[in-house]
Structure formats: C-alpha cells, structure tokens
Regions:
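Intrinsically disordered, low-complexity terminal regions
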Residues: 1-146
C-alpha cells in the first residue's frame, strides 16, 4: 500500500506507484510513470532519449520532484505546482533549462483552506519529442541537467 520505492537501474521503462513514500530512480533509459500520494520523487535519466518512447510522467500529492536529464535530451516540458493557501509550504519551479514560468496572481477557488494558486512551466529542448509531464501539490519541481 505505502512505502518507499527505489530502482537502481532500468533499461526500458519504469511504472511505479505508492500510496505514501519516496520514489527514487537512480538511472533510467526509457519511459517513466511514477506516482506517490505523499512523498518526494527523484529520477535521473541517462541516454539521449532518441530510441523509442522516453516520455516522463511524475506526480506527487505532497512532495518535491527532482528530474535530472542529459543536457541535449530532446523534450517538451509541461510542469504544474498547485499551492494551497492552507499549507505553510509553497512550491516553486527551479530549472537549468530555459522555460516560461507563470504564477497565478490571485487565489482561486472557494474562500478558506481550499484556495489555491498554480505555478506552471512550459518549454522545449531540441525537437521536443519526449514529453515531460510533472505535477505536485505544495512542493518544488527541480529540473537539472548533467
């Protein structure tokens, strides 16, 4: 049901889901679909993402997400952080790659603890062929290059 997941190396793909716990993928060459209901996600992509599907989908309901990719990885970013007014933690997007980052000016939704603001990041590198979709609530998204 819940608990941490750690994968040291995967060649083709990883699909990982936990109800609560950290997900760490030390090396992946193919596609990734990783979801946690509460915890951080850390993924390092190796290779160039040119052979087949190398899309990346990462989602956490409450945690930081860090993705490290090669500097010439061809990708399109679609990033979103939902910050809730009731939370003391407010997430940001930090990226080694250029992208457009937009933060909503006003709180959305009904008054009270359910009010939220989104921070989104969009951009591409090279052909943009690999789709990078990352979403978290009240956490940071960090994109690094190696």
């Amino acid at each position: 049901m819940g608990g941490a997941i750690r994968i040291k190396r995967a060649k083709q793909f990883v699909k990982a889901k936990t109800m609560g716990g950290k997900i760490t993928i030390d090396e992946i060459e193919g596609w990734v679909d990783a979801t946690t209901m509460g915890g951080d996600i850390k993924v390092e992509v190796v290779g160039k993402g040119q052979n087949g599907n190398a899309d990346i989908k990462l989602s956490s309901m409450n945690g930081d997400i860090t993705l490290t990719v090669p500097k010439k990885y061809e990708m399109t970013f679609d990033l979103e952080i939902v910050n809730y007014k009731s939370s003391s933690e407010k997430g940001n997007i930090i990226s080694d790659f250029e992208m457009d980052i937009l933060e909503e000016d006003a709180w959305q939704g009904d008054s009270g603890n359910d009010q939220r603001k989104s921070v989104t990041g969009k951009g591409s590198v090279g052909s943009g062929k690999n789709k990078i979709s990352i979403k978290t609530h009240n956490g940071n998204i960090v994109i690094k290059k190696h």
